[in-house]
């Protein structure tokens, strides 16, 4: 059986990266929430 997690840095950046987050209203909300919380890392 194939495992569900097949790591790929390209897919990781495209799906969860900073620019992917900024592309949608909901994504910008996530970034702002993480900024307000004082996260060291905002996105993948």
UniProtKB/Swiss-Prot annotation:
PANTHER family referenced in this protein's UniProt entry, alphabetically: LARGE RIBOSOMAL SUBUNIT PROTEIN BL34M (PTHR14503:SF4), MITOCHONDRIAL RIBOSOMAL PROTEIN 34 FAMILY MEMBER (PTHR14503)
GO biological process per UniProt: translation
Record-level GO cellular component terms: ribonucleoprotein complex; ribosome
Keyword field: Ribonucleoprotein, Ribosomal protein
Cross-referenced InterPro entries: Ribosomal_bL34 (IPR000271), Ribosomal_bL34_CS (IPR020939)
Species per Swiss-Prot/TrEMBL record: Roseobacter denitrificans (strain ATCC 33942 / OCh 114)
An example Gene Ontology molecular-function term: structural constituent of ribosome
Name recorded for this polypeptide: Large ribosomal subunit protein bL34
Keyword Ribosomal protein listed: yes
Family designation: Belongs to the bacterial ribosomal protein bL34 family.
Gene3D superfamilies: 1.10.287.3980
Keyword Ribonucleoprotein tagged: yes
């Amino acid at each position: 059986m194939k495992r569900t997690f097949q790591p790929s840095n390209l897919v990781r950046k495209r799906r969860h990266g900073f620019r992917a987050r900024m592309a949608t209203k909901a994504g910008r909300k996530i970034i702002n929430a993480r900024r307000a919380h004082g996260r060291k890392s905002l996105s993948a």
